[in-house]
Swiss-Prot record:
The gene is petL. This is Cytochrome b6-f complex subunit 6. InterPro entries: Cyt_b6/f_cplx_su6. It is a single-pass membrane protein. It holds the Pfam family PetL. GO terms for biological process: photosynthesis. The keyword Glycoprotein does not apply. It is found in: Plastid, Chloroplast thylakoid membrane. Component of the cytochrome b6-f complex, which mediates electron transfer between photosystem II (PSII) and photosystem I (PSI), cyclic electron flow around PSI, and state transitions. PetL is important for photoautotrophic growth as well as for electron transfer efficiency and stability of the cytochrome b6-f complex. The 4 large subunits of the cytochrome b6-f complex are cytochrome b6, subunit IV (17 kDa polypeptide, PetD), cytochrome f and the Rieske protein, while the 4 small subunits are PetG, PetL, PetM and PetN. The complex functions as a dimer. GO terms for molecular function: electron transporter, transferring electrons within cytochrome b6/f complex of photosystem II activity.
Length: 32
């Protein structure tokens, strides 16, 4: 059970980081 929860946390964290980087790149492109 703990492994499933920790895996989900890692998955959500990775998705959040990807979204933040993607949005940051979009804003950077718009600024240029």
């Amino acid at each position: 059970m703990l492994t499933i929860i920790s895996y989900l946390v890692l998955l959500v964290g990775a998705l959040t980081v990807t979204l933040v980087i993607y949005l940051g790149l979009l804003k950077g492109v718009k600024l240029i």
